[in-house]
Amino acid sequence: MNNLRTVSDTKRAFYSIHTRPVNSVYRRVVEELMVEMHLLRVNEDFRYDPIFALGVTTSFDRFMDGYQPENDKDAIFSAICKAQEADPVQMKKDGQRLTELAQSKSAQEMLDWITQAANSGGDELQWQLRNIAQNPKFKYSRLFAIGLFTLLELSEGNITQDEESLAEFLPNICTVLNISESKLQKDLEIYRGNLDKIAQVRQAMDDILEAQKKRREADQAKKEGSDDTPTTEASTPDSEPTSEVSS
């Protein structure tokens, strides 16, 4: 009997954990991330690692930026993880560890750290990277690519803003970790394009909300101005005698 969880199982679990409605504009983001994580976790070659965790947390934070109510974001992330029996606390903790590491290094130092990890291990994080580099069945994913990109983005100098420097670093990282450069480049191109698209959508939404706010303020000012205007009766002095004279 096959007890493998299905996408429908994961979605049902999510909506049973997070019972508040998800803002319709962001529902697709939530469900796509949830499905992507699900398909990876049911793959027999998938192994959880901190770079994947950083990719998940970064993807969620970037694409859910601006979500309202803001207080629901943590609950939604937690429900996404718990729906597929992942630990949201560990996911955030691992992502934060790599974030702090990247922020303390330059891009070259980050590459050197990854290279050392792949060749000889080191601390706990480096041994996990060594396992990735030496695993011929390593299950590469878009979320792993986003995690790698984020390491370079957070490092001193942020070379991701320099296309020439980025083009030099990415092939080296792919070689060190034994992952496909073409897949990584394609996934990052889509990721960056989607970030641009969602930024445009958010700007359009902000413009609409601002226009609605100004219209409400104008309507309110017009109403208040109308309320303050004296009526004709109130402004007319006592009535003069009629022109009709009794004979």
UniProtKB/Swiss-Prot annotation:
Skewed-composition ranges (Basic and acidic residues): 210-226
Record's Pfam families? Answer: ThylakoidFormat
Where are the compositionally biased (Polar residues) regions? 228-247
**Coiled-coil residue spans:** 198-224
Per its UniProt record, what InterPro entries does this chain match?
Answer: Thf1
Name a single GO cellular component: plasma membrane-derived thylakoid photosystem II
Residue span of region Disordered = 209-247
The free-text function statement in the UniProt record for this protein reads:
May be involved in photosynthetic membrane biogenesis.
Q: Which family does it belong to?
A: Belongs to the THF1 family.
What is the protein named?
Protein Thf1
Biological source species: Acaryochloris marina (strain MBIC 11017)
Q: Which gene encodes it?
A: thf1
